[in-house]
Amino acid sequence: MTDYIPTFRFDGHLTIVTGACGGLAEALIKGLLAYGSDIALLDIDQEKTAAKQAEYHKYATEELKLKEVPKMGSYACDISDSDTVHKVFAQVAKDFGKLPLHLVNTAGYCENFPCEDYPAKNAEKMVKVNLLGSLYVSQAFAKPLIKEGIKGASVVLIGSMSGAIVNDPQNQVVYNMSKAGVIHLAKTLACEWAKYNIRVNSLNPGYIYGPLTKNVINGNEELYNRWISGIPQQRMSEPKEYIGAVLYLLSESAASYTTGASLLVDGGFTSW
C-alpha cells in the first residue's frame, strides 16, 4: 500500500503558469515553489513578469528558506494569439532543457455589460482570451509531449463557478459562457488525451477576496453583503485556499485517476 500514499512533491518537474502576475497565480506559484517545481512564469507584460519572478525568488529564500530555489523564468505571452503561445512554449522548453509536465492556466479576465448592450469587440476579445486562450495553451503544452511519448502530464484550467451557475447580481454573460466553455474544454481534452496519459481538469473558484474583487466592491458594503449572503461559509475565499486543490489535481500520485473533473471550490455557493 505504500506506493499508493500520495506525494505532492514536484522536484525536477517543470510547470508553466499563465497569468503569473495575478493574485491567484501568485498563491499557486508560491505553493509550487514550496513543493519543488521549476516554474515558467507567463504573462502579457514582460517587465512586470520579471519583477514578479524576483518577488517569488525572494519569497523562496526568505519565507520558505530554501537553500536551493527551483529554477524560474519569465516570459511575455498573449494567450489569445496561437502563434505566440506556441513560440513561447517552445522557448520555455529550450531554456529549461526539458518539456513541462504541468500547466496551470490562470490567465483571463472579467468585465460586465448588460447582455443587450454587450459590445461585440469586447465579447470577441473575452472569448479569445478566456476560452480560446485556454485551448491554445493546452495545445502548445500537449503536442510536444504526445510527439515525444512522455506520459504522466497534467493540466489545470481555471474556470469559475460562473461557468456552472448564473450568479446574481453581475451582468457578465460573456464571462459566464467563456468559463462554461473552459469547463467543457477540460472535459473534452481529458477524453481525447487520456490515451496519452495526459490528465486535464478544471478548477472553478468562487468569490476570491483579492485586488480585483476589492476594486469592484470599492467600499460598497451593500454589494459585499449581497455577495456573501449566498455563500454558506459567509465569507469570500483567499487565493491561498486554492493551493491544495491545484497541487492535488497536478499530482500524478495523488490524482492519477482524476481527469475531466470540474472541481468547484466556492465555499458551498453552488450547493444552495
Swiss-Prot record:
SUPFAM superfamilies, per database record: NAD(P)-binding Rossmann-fold domains
Triggers of expression: Strongly expressed during growth on L-arabinose.
Gene Ontology biological-process entries: L-arabinose catabolic process
Record keywords, A-Z: NADP, Oxidoreductase
Protein name: NADH-dependent L-xylulose reductase
Record GO terms (molecular function): D-arabinitol 2-dehydrogenase activity; L-xylulose reductase (NADH) activity; oxidoreductase activity, acting on NAD(P)H, oxygen as acceptor
Active-site residues, Swiss-Prot/TrEMBL: S160 (proton donor), Y175 (proton acceptor), K179 (lowers pka of active site tyr)
Enzyme Commission number(s): 1.1.1.15, 1.1.1.250
Keyword NADP set for record: yes
Family under the similarity heading: Belongs to the short-chain dehydrogenases/reductases (SDR) family.
